[in-house]
Amino acid sequence: MPDRRHLLFVGDGSFQLTAQEVSTILRHDYKPVIFLINNGGYLIERCYLGKTSSFNDVANWAYADLPKVFRPDTTARSFVVKTVADLDKALSAPNDTLIFIEASMDPFDAPVAVIESGNNGADLDYGPRGPQHRSNMLLRPAT
């Protein structure tokens, strides 16, 4: 392991596919900072096709509890962040162990480039008559 601290940013949908790796991180006493973006589902898929499609939703786990689940005697610190003040508190915590930060986000909060990429991909795959053109399906950048 390099001497520098690792930062991991992962969405809740992706994390649910690989959550057990937190156990490996704890077993080897690695000390990354994990930012879990909890937006209730697969944001990239919502941008691509299906803003309101339920298949893009994932179950809401108690993510911040998982380090204790995988290793009950862990010294890892977990935080659920909903405000800037919460984030400041999490980032000010001693960093001598794994830090797990669950950041709650709006399900449709996406960078403009991601939204545009999703819209373009849907147009390429499905054309102008595709279901992505229904008004309730398309994500649009905030104005």
Predicted regions and their residues:
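Thiamine diphosphate
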Residues: 1-143
